[in-house]
Amino acid sequence: MNKSRTLLNSAIVLYFVICLEILIMISPFAGFFYSAFNPVLLGLAKYPETRWLSSFFFTHLLVPPNDFLKFIRIMGSVLFVLGMVVFLICALQVYASKFFKTGPALKGLYSRIRHPQYLSLAVAGIGLAILWPRFLVVILWISMVFVYYLLARDEERRMQKQHPETYPEYIKTTGMLLPKRVEDAIHFSTGGGKAAAFIVVAALAVGGAFLLRDYTVHHLPVWAESNIVALPIVPGDQGMLEFRMADILQVP
């Protein structure tokens, strides 16, 4: 039980850290937060090996400049809302089963996947990473996925002890985090398959973030002259920016 509580607390802390900067940025305490948190970001930026962690890989204060990037931004909101809604539905199902003492939740999404609540939180985490796109958030998301896997394993051990008549058979017919057919195809049930799946997920997350940053940078409507670089908040203001910047630079 202590191990379960530790894993659960770790997952909660990771999700809280991911959400924290977003919540504070829309609050009146943004200045205070950055005065306290800025040394951490500066510490990361101090060394070439960790500098990338504090940087952004997608627009967050600017309107995305093209339809593809706008679609990515919208999908961030969709994934976050969808993940949280599915999580709440799954949580309601689990607690209803406990309240009415009907045994483990085996219907709905649980009839295909044993831990849809963790999968839905991971999906919501992808949405959060798009809405507040620091590389550090991506690394925290990868860590969170690993903690969810440990939670799922610990939960299954406890459920097999509590429901030895139904849960072992349930495990044979369902997947842990993906439909059983998918997990069988990637050999997820083996230790090597799990390790390979985690490495692939981590590589896709970090590599995808770098690719998105490269694409975003190459499509930003940048105005530059000498050592001055400017960006319009709204892409439609690029013409005004080009027209006015020459006059602005003449102001003493």
Give the ranges of each region predicted by the language model:
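Membrane-anchoring alpha-helices and their flanking helix-loop junctions
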Residues: M1-L106, L119-A246, Q250-P252
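Alpha-helical architecture
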Residues: V81, R112-I113
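Conserved SAM-binding loop
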Residues: I113-L119
